[in-house]
Amino acid sequence: ELTATLNAAMKMGFNKVWAIFQPHTFSRTAMLLDDFAEALKIPDQAIISAILPVRETNTYNIYSTDLGAKVPGSVCLDTFEEITDYVCKNAKEGDLILTMGGGNVYMCANMIYKQLKYMEENK
């Protein structure tokens, strides 16, 4: 799903495609680390949030930075606030910003929208 979505997005003619990805569970991230890394090399910019643990503890000793290390140019940020600030400072008109993952990463979309709207209204 990740690969198919990102490949399709890259063909849509946007200036730049951003993928904000929230890994879901430590076990799944450990098992699919290389697959996630290959998919996250597709967009122009990948932002990786902290792993959403759900009910797990990190017995796998895996972190978002492990995934980020496999994706050249990616940025690992722990909080949605940090992600929002980074995107709002760096994204440009004509860019596509996707939120992807099995958790609450969708909340970033609304946060980014609100911050960009505020920035536009207070130029």
Locate the predicted segments by residue:
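ATP-dependent carboxylate-amine ligase
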Residues: 1-123
